[in-house]
Structure formats: C-alpha cells, structure tokens
Amino acid sequence: MKSIENIDEFKNLLNPPSKIYYKGNLELLKARKIAVIGSRKMSVYTKNCLLELVALLKKAKICVVSGGALGVDIQAAKIAYPQTIAVFANGLDEVYPKANANEILNIYENALALSENEANYKAKPYDFLLRNRLIIALSEVIIIAQADLKSGSMQSARLALSMNKPIYVLPHRKNESEGTNLLLATKKANLIYDFEEFVKMFGEIYPEQKEDELLNFLKHEDDLEKVLQKFGDKVYEYELEGLVEIFGVKIKTCV
C-alpha cells in the first residue's frame, strides 16, 4: 500500500483528508469519473439496468467510482473493471465486506482502491459517511441506481447537492426505490431516459475491441506447425501485414 498527499478533487472539501492511501493504478484519476452507488439489496431490474448502463460507460472510457459495498456498488465495479475506483472506509489491508473479497482484490491489482485511513484500520459506522464525501467529490456526476428513503445513498444525495454535483437516477415503479423517486419528485435528480444518450453527454462510445484469436493463441504457443494446423493461410497473411514473424519452425507476434 502506498500513499499520496492528496488528490485535486479533495482539496476544496471542508474537511479534506490529510493523506490518501491507495492500491492500484493512479492513472485512473485522470479519466472522467462518474459515481454509481445505491442499495445493498438491489432488484433484478436494477441489476439488468446496470449491466447495460455501466457497460456503455466503460466503452466511453469513463471511470466508475463506488464504495465497493454489497449490491449496486460492487455490481457496478465488476462491470466497469478495470476502469473503476473504489473508495473504502476501512484501511486497505482490511478487506471489507468479505463477501466481495475476490472483486476487491482484483481492484487492488488492476483498478484503483483509495482510503483516507491507515492499512489495518477497521471502519466504524461514521467512517462510511466520511467515505461518501470522497466518492462524491471525486465524481463529475452521481448515479443513484436504487435507494430506500432512509439509506446511505440518500445521505450521499444530500452531500452531492451540497457540492453542486448533478444527480441522475434510474426509472422505477411506484413503491420501488422510494428514495430516488422522491429525488425526482422534488426535482433534485434527473431521470436517465436513454442510457446511450446519457453516456454520450460525457464521451464517445467506442465499439468493443475483440481479441484477435490468432494473436491471442501466440501468447502461449510458438510452434509454427501447430499454429498452421489451427489457422492455415491466415498465418502467412499476418506475416505479410507485419503482425507476426516466422523464423524456422517458430513464430512470434510483432505487436
């Protein structure tokens, strides 16, 4: 675990952290960032919405920020991975919640985890509220996917309003996600009608790049005969294009 003195987005907070501890890729801080937060007990409908919406955010090279909690937070992080930042209330040597351990360890390795608390710090209830201010400060806008009236997500909504951060919510039926419905009714949040149009406000949606089967195969095989058996004349086409190099009975990629 390493530390940095501060992050630009935190400097204008009334109570900025004195130090930020991190694991992972600090380059993600340079990306446009959108928070995706919400209920720990999300509905199947919310999960399906996230699968579509967050996948589009990822294609637009937007980094998804969350708290790594159960439910909406970790679902958004999994879809966005490795373009995701998780802000934790606990120290980063304390993996919490344990149910998300695999996903959190992946974030440590290939995405970015942040905390204002030292390595082995065990979070207390008020630390989660303090953590939420960092999520809001870090993000350009806040998406609250689902929330009850009395929830941490509604406290985050109040924080977002105090920081003049736009809030967006998903459409929900009456008596579902009453917190986000209230934000809409009181004109404190905007409704995401169309996922693609929403994402286009923040960046171009790039087509998903498919891994090249032949080049991928060469990552673990350099025997020319075996490669020819599988891909035939395509191997020589790739050689002419300068994508592969053949020397004797061996072959390797040039990219």
Indicate where each model-derived feature is located:
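Glycine-biased, small-residue-rich flexible motifs in mid-sequence functional cores and linkers
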Residues: K2-V255
